[in-house]
Amino acid sequence: MANTSSAKKATRKIARRTAVNKSRRTQMRGSVRIVEEAIASGDRDAALKAMARAEPELMRAAQRNIIHRNAASRKVSRLTHSIAKLAK
């Protein structure tokens, strides 16, 4: 339990930031899920369109320290590789 007023304020700030980050993380995961569903269905055009939306979401999340930048790059790389395999 926070005792000082500054600690109480820090607790409030953390709660607000956590709520914002949770929302952004959910939005990012949703956009990635759409790409994965398009890949699973074999629809290359839909996957490319979804990827065009998902990649900026991932990189924005990395920039805002919601996920690690290497994790974002790895996810983009794996999704791109999966889409490329659809063309073959």
UniProtKB/Swiss-Prot annotation:
GO terms for cellular component: cytosol; small ribosomal subunit. Gene3D superfamilies: Ribosomal protein S20. Residues 1-28 are annotated as: Disordered. InterPro entries: Ribosomal_bS20 (IPR002583), Ribosomal_bS20_sf (IPR036510). The keyword Manganese does not apply. It comes from the Bacteria. One of its GO terms (molecular function) is structural constituent of ribosome. GO terms for biological process: translation. Keywords: Ribonucleoprotein, Ribosomal protein, RNA-binding, rRNA-binding. NCBIfam families: S20. Binds directly to 16S ribosomal RNA. HAMAP family: Ribosomal_bS20 (MF_00500). Belongs to the bacterial ribosomal protein bS20 family. This is Small ribosomal subunit protein bS20. It comes from Rhodopseudomonas palustris (strain ATCC BAA-98 / CGA009). The gene is rpsT.
